[in-house]
């Protein structure tokens, strides 16, 4: 079931989403956001180190690309779409550019909220999301767990972002791994 919100999508005016990592999962989320009309392609910036991948994302999706982490300074939402072993390096370059109002979404498997808070700052709005591969068609099912800094208005933004990918269930972090094992392996069968 889609999480219902007290606001319409039109009430949410996001200016910019910045992705760190433009691999397959990041691209799947990006495609869902564009397809779901959450944002226009030019409102998405992808920080990606590989020149060929940047060129591909620009041509395929019409998004902006960069290697400059300072792009996060003007983002409403930052999505960490990198492998778990890359999180420490990404958070190190990202931290100086985040405001307390920026919502940080991590899809890095196994990286706890406490770890992200330690690396980005305990005052940051952070959530973990584990999407499955069906997000590419808008039929995904994602688990999300949030830290205490995420307020009701933030949750509306988050829910509108995640609903573009399919259905979302908010769970406690201790249930996160169980959800991941159940819902993320199912689509391959």
Labelled PLM ranges:
Residues 175-189:
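Helical "substrate-binding/catalytic lid" subdomain
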Residues 7-60, 64-67, 139-140:
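NAD(P)+-binding Rossmann beta1-loop-alpha1 motif at the extreme N-terminus of oxidoreductases
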Residues 18, 158, 186:
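Residue-level signature of catalytic and energy-coupling elements of molecular machines
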Residues 60-61, 69-144:
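Rossmann-like NAD(P)(H) cofactor-binding subdomain of soluble oxidoreductases
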Residues 26, 54, 75, 87, ...:
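A general structural signal for well-ordered alpha-helical segments in protein cores
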Residues 115-125, 141-179:
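Internal alpha-helical scaffold of NAD(P)-dependent oxidoreductase catalytic cores
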